């Protein structure tokens, strides 16, 4: 029994880690973002994206993949925006967000859209690397 266990342990140790996780090779990364709107303010969040934010993202090299709203109450229907951005690399994402935050147009749009209070109360971000079998690369 011991030789079999030793064989299994050796096999597991020799498996390349790349089989289990996509490498961070500087290639494209996707950013999954979820915004929770202040109560009753999702229409304001959507309008800000539709009318301003997407164009500002584009100007800073942030590629929009898609935008969605949950359809089930348990997932935040009526109060959340979920979207995905594509960045050339993690470093490019960091740079783009830094530039976006100080963009004069963004600052004006943000201030104007929040004249009656904050419209986003929670922001979540997850960076994702495509697997070797992903249609998005």
Segments from the language model and where they lie:
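A short, glycine/Asx- and small/polar-enriched loop/turn
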Residues: 75-81
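Surface-exposed interaction/gating patches
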Residues: 25-46, 52, 56, 130-137
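Bacterial N-terminal signal peptides
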Residues: 6-18
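Solvent-exposed loop/turn segments at secondary-structure junctions
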Residues: 70-74, 88-92, 131-133
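Solvent-exposed beta-strand motifs enriched in subsets of small alpha/beta binding domains
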Residues: 34, 83-85
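An amphipathic, aromatic/His-enriched active-site/gating alpha helix that lines ligand/cofactor pockets
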Residues: 23-26, 47-65, 77, 86-127
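N-terminal secretory signal peptides that target proteins for export/translocation
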Residues: 1-3
């Amino acid at each position: 029994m011991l030789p079999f266990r030793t064989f299994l342990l050796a096999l597991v140790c020799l498996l390349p880690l790349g089989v289990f996780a996509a490498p961070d090779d500087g290639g494209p990364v996707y950013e999954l973002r979820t915004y929770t709107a202040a109560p009753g303010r999702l229409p304001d969040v959507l309008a800000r994206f539709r009318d301003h934010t997407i164009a500002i993202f584009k100007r800073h090299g942030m590629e929009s993949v898609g935008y969605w709203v949950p359809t089930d109450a348990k997932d935040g229907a009526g109060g959340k925006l979920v979207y995905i951005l594509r960045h050339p690399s993690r470093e490019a994402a960091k740079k783009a967000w830094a530039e976006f935050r100080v963009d004069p147009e963004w600052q004006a749009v943000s201030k104007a859209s929040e004249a009656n209070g904050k419209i986003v109360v929670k922001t979540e971000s997850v960076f994702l690397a495509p697997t070797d079998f992903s249609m998005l690369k």
